[in-house]
Amino acid sequence: VKRAEILEATRVCVCGEREQDYGTPENNFATIGYFWGVYLNAAHPEYTKAFPYNGITAKDVAAMMALLKVARIATGSSADSFVDLAGYAACAGEIVTAENGGTA
């Protein structure tokens, strides 16, 4: 698979079907971060000060999902994992740009 094909598959996925299914990355990742925080506080109360329930941001979720993909790539990769990795990076970049008032 060529770079351009991976990036095109990422664009189709991230800018089309994923957003239609799950909403914007900012909103979806913020919800995931909230639930992860609630879970971590319930499962590991000793971490409450370090990770308050609202302390995992949409940007954090994008970064951690990218790390999940890197871990999968390390143990056996398929082109799909690289498509997903590029998608999480693109979403993180968009989230950071929005947080910075539209500048990267």
Report residues per predicted region.
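Intrinsically disordered, low-complexity regulatory regions
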Residues: 1-104
